Regions:
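Helix-turn-helix
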Residues: 13, 17-59
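N-terminal intrinsically disordered/low-complexity leader segments
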Residues: 1-9
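Short, basic, alpha-helical segments at the C-terminal edge of helix-turn-helix-like DNA-binding modules
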Residues: 62-68
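Solvent-exposed, amphipathic alpha-helical segments
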Residues: 13, 17-25, 71-75, 107, ...
């Protein structure tokens, strides 16, 4: 691992290595020894930046969630006009459509398994899900205000439903990618959002 002056940058680098290990070999591969070996550094360096495995996993999960949020934000900001296509693009930004987003979903699924029995990790998971849901609700609300979606649409319920659809679709796509290639994922989401438009 090259020398890095910035503490946060070093933590992010270690978390990237951890995410790669989770994707390739699962959570059991995430030990300070395995991470140090993969990063070409020592366990002392890894333990300098993370108190324990839980701290490392929480940070790795948070980094994956932040990447998804940045993809969503970038998609919305790239649209010159806010319309139904904006919502489709925002949802697609959350799906496992490429190598990076598939890795992020694998990290999330691994983390969720731990969060079932750990209240701190469960709270972290809830916070990230609520953040994504709130962002989708904000976008859906704008589309209702602009007349692109029915005025009687339940915004909060629609955002909640849409996020559940994303999570279910992502699970199918990550664990059965041949059956759920990116074009099929996109078509599925487009159909779901078209149903929102019809009310």
């Amino acid at each position: 691992m090259p020398p890095l002056a910035d503490h946060d940058e070093r933590r992010a680098t270690v978390a990237e290595v951890a995410a790669d290990l989770i994707e390739q070999r699962g959570l059991d591969a995430v030990t300070f020894r395995e991470i140090a070996d993969a990063a070409g550094t020592s366990t002392a360096i890894v333990s300098h930046y993370f108190i324990d495995k839980k701290d490392l996993l929480r940070f790795t999960y948070g980094a994956a969630a932040s990447r998804a949020r940045r993809r969503l934000d970038a998609q919305v900001e790239a649209e010159s006009e806010v319309d139904e296509k904006t919502l489709v693009g925002a949802v697609e930004a959350l799906l496992p459509l490429d190598k990076g987003s598939r890795r992020d979903w694998r990290v999330w699924f691994a983390f969720w398994g731990l969060a079932v029995a750990d209240p701190d990790l469960a709270a972290e998971q809830r916070a990230h899900v609520r953040g994504a849901r709130d962002e989708l609700a904000g976008l859906i609300g704008r589309l209702v205000t602009l007349g692109h979606l029915p005025e009687d649409l339940e915004v909060e319920d629609s955002a909640r439903d849409l996020l559940v659809v994303v999570m279910g679709l992502a699970a199918q796509a990550v664990f059965d990618p041949k059956d759920w290639p990116p074009p099929r994922q996109r078509a599925f989401i487009a159909r779901h959002i078209a149903r929102l438009s019809r009310g």
